[in-house]
Amino acid sequence: MNNTLNQHYEEKVRPCIDLIDSLRSLGVEKDLALPAIAVIGDQSSGKSSVLEALSGVALPRGSGIVTRCPLELKMKRKREGEEWHGKISYQDHEEEIEDPSDVEKKIREAQDEMAGVGVGISDDLISLEIGSPDVPDLTLIDLPGIARVAVKGQPENIGEQIKRLIRKFIMKQETINLVVVPCNVDIATTEALQMAQEVDPEGERTLGILTKPDLVDKGTEETVVDIVHNEVIHLTKGYMIVKCRGQKEIMERVSLTEATEREKAFFKEHAHLSTLYDEGHATIPKLAEKLTLELVHHIEKSLPRLEEQIEAKLSETHAELERYGTGPPEDSAERIYFLIDKVTAFTQDAINLSTGEELKSGVRLNVFSTLRQEFGKWKLHLDRSGENFNQRIEGEVSNYEKTYRGRELPGFINYKTFEVMVKDQIKQLEEPAVKKLKEISDAVRKVFLLLAQSSFTGFPNLLKSAKTKIEAIKQVNESTAESMLRTQFKMEMIVYTQDSTYSHSLSERKREEEDDRPLPTPKIRSTIFSTDNHATLQEMMLHLKSYYRISSQRLADQIPMVIRYLVLQEFASQLQREMLQTLQEKDNIEQLLKEDFDIGSKRAALQNKLKRLMKARSYLVEF
């Protein structure tokens, strides 16, 4: 195939295309989109014939779905006199092709291998490389033809499957969409062009190829000329028109070289289409030249963004790998040190968690904000309980006086009444205190479990060991704390405080009461103090409120201290002791270091991705 590119540009073309082909063969397309030309068309649009004419080899053709997998067609122009060379690769298979006539058979075998024998399709890529003096420097991706109706043996939704596969390629901004449309159909109704317009409404990355100009109805030739002149449906990249071998010429074994000569003669001699030939819009050689120029320009334009994307992906992959860690070493001595480091880091973070210090691992966990909130709620509960107590004292004191008053003369405080009421009030606080303990114990347990999950990601046995210890320590320490709390409340049943403390509280309470109560008139004052029972009641209320204030202040501090010591501080210390004890059990080391298969394979995949991206970056730097 004669290529009209000048020598200077040819020297630039191959390296550009080779760069992208190298990146694609590295598998970089798994990580980001690469510049490409995707070929799409309705069934029987002449798509295969165009690709055959460009590549110089026969591709699978026939009725129904012929292209059943995306086919990457890498064409490399060789010097005159150099031998034809072919290679096909897919999945883990790679095979040299000695004879151009074997290409069609090899593609069919690959499609049967990947999409199953029959008429199914697959998203997996087949790569076909062709080196020849008769091909342009060009890489295309051929996609299955758009099917409207399922045929025998095909799933009912085959049309949707194909469209989904096509969209996956053509929606990428890095892809030039080559839309093949026969001249003898209404271009506006072709599904391939409609799909291209959906993803590229302005037509900035869509190039139209008209085929089968020999089948144009008489009188409609000018419409074809108008389409190619971009006057019907506008595409920024415009249109080309080609005439490939028809079925009759294939049956007559007309060679591709002869078909190119016939195509040239057809356009030059055509009454209406010759103008398109003169303008450089017609024939396969002109199409090859345009596609090569378009691809190279597209690659050059995409390179800066590609470099940015690779850098971003490298950074992202490094960060992900850090989360998965390095994995256990192979050497047995190093494995022990690896386990020691892992367990020590976890236990140190557990201690830091219990003291409110920053975690070495960098994990964002904080148990103290929860404790502060919960202890604040406990203090609020005590205050509200005191307010309720104050409100009901008057009625209850009167009832208790009737029940417990003995031989005392009027005006004397009944200590028994005072004691019973205080004990009853404090007793009501016991269960809320135990409930608060359990809530905080659960919250602390959850935080330690989160720390274990973060510290032992990918090591299920080590994580299980830590979780088992956390659950056991939680049960024991919670039980001990509950016992201590209940003992505290038993001690609170002894009505006691230092005389000076009580006197101070009583004086404070009297002062508050006097400040809150308006000064009574002499008449009212004499009435109040002449009523012995009322005087007793007023004084009793002062004593009750004063003592409750002392007791509640004790409980406001003591309950949180018990909880914090046993449920957090002692919990962390015990967890540290037991986890470090695990390191003494030499027989369990291998079991503990057994890695989660998914994590191991994920790390391996990330390491491969990192190598792939670093190699890609080096290609771009060297380019």
UniProtKB/Swiss-Prot annotation:
Can you give the residue ranges of the GED domain? Answer: 537-623
Per UniProt, subcellular location reads as:
Cytoplasm
Q: Which Pfam families match?
A: Dynamin_M, Dynamin_N, GED
Q: Please name the CDD domains in this protein's record.
A: DLP_1
Q: What is the source species?
A: Oncorhynchus mykiss
Keyword set includes rRNA-binding: no
Where does the record place the region G4 motif?
211-214
Q: Name one GO cellular component term.
A: cytosol
Q: Which GO terms describe its biological process?
A: defense response to virus; receptor internalization; response to type I interferon; synaptic vesicle budding from presynaptic endocytic zone membrane
InterPro entries the UniProt entry points to: Dynamin (IPR022812), Dynamin_GTPase (IPR001401), Dynamin_GTPase_CS (IPR019762), Dynamin_N (IPR045063), Dynamin_stalk (IPR000375), G_DYNAMIN_dom (IPR030381), GED (IPR003130), GED_dom (IPR020850)
Sites where the protein binds GTP: 41-48, 142-146, 211-214
Official protein name in the record: Interferon-induced GTP-binding protein Mx3
Q: In this protein, which residues make up the domain named Dynamin-type G?
A: 31-304
User: Segment G3 motif: which positions?
Assistant: 142-145
PANTHER family xrefs? DYNAMIN, INTERFERON-INDUCED GTP-BINDING PROTEIN MX-RELATED
User: What induces this protein's gene, according to its Swiss-Prot or TrEMBL record?
Assistant: By polyinosinic-polycytidylic acid (poly I:C) and viral haemorrhagic septicaemia virus (VHSV) strain 07.71 in muscle, head kidney, spleen and liver.
| Family classification | Belongs to the TRAFAC class dynamin-like GTPase superfamily. Dynamin/Fzo/YdjA family.
**Which segments carry the region annotation G1 motif?**
41-48
Keyword annotations of the record: Cytoplasm, GTP-binding, Nucleotide-binding
Any one GO molecular-function label of the UniProt entry? GTPase activity
According to the lineage, what is the superkingdom? Eukaryota
